[in-house]
Amino acid sequence: MKNGFIRVLDIAEQLGVTGATIRKDLRILESQGVLYRTHGSASPVKPHVTDISIDEKASQHAIEKQAIARAAQTLIKPDDAIILASGSTVTAFAEALSPVGMVNVVTPSLGIATLMNRRNNVKVFILGGALYNNSFSVRGEYAEAGLKNVSCSKLYIGCDGIDLASGITCATIEEARLTNAMMSAASQTVVLADSSKFGRRGFGKIGMLEDIDIIITDSGIPDTLREKIEDAGVQIIIVD
């Protein structure tokens, strides 16, 4: 088992039975609520996520998030213009960010805006809208409208789930809508997600795998998922 996942092929090989037999048994176990099936694997972790506070998220997989944040810095160019979404991993990126040259940063996050405003070579543009306590960021039609006159090189987002069938998801529809608007305002979308997000699903759908360009994650990502994501044309950067 790797990162909470076990592959159907591995079980079949260990037990000396066919993959079809294992898949049948997994369907029975899933119906009993013992596990959850994904493409080619199974997990004891419930795949559906709920909206929790950014403070709670920040305490989860903190070491992996810091490593992801350091790797994400290498994509920043001098005099760049970027969008930073809300979320604990993107906040970790903002904390680590030390750009060369003047950088324009657009964000819906009050926390990230405050962090970026402390840097002399960063100009911050904060979106307006309804403030959500869990994320300490704004969402809604005013935030979406504020992106119509923006053109950036990259958008950095977190997510609550990455699944082959459902794509990139988050906990709420409101967050998904704003993320879609941010994607339209950027040339590239970079997903910052620790490996615990793979095989999970949120209620709000951001997009399919082919809608994003780069995923930065840690080495806990299951090999089967990594291969299929790369087959979809997504670049994956793995950090230790």
What are the roles of these predicted feature ranges?
Residues 1-88, 94-106, 110, 117-122:
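HTH-adjacent hinge/linker in prokaryotic transcriptional regulators
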Residues 4-9, 16, 31, 64, ...:
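Conserved phosphate- and dinucleotide-binding cores of soluble alpha/beta proteins
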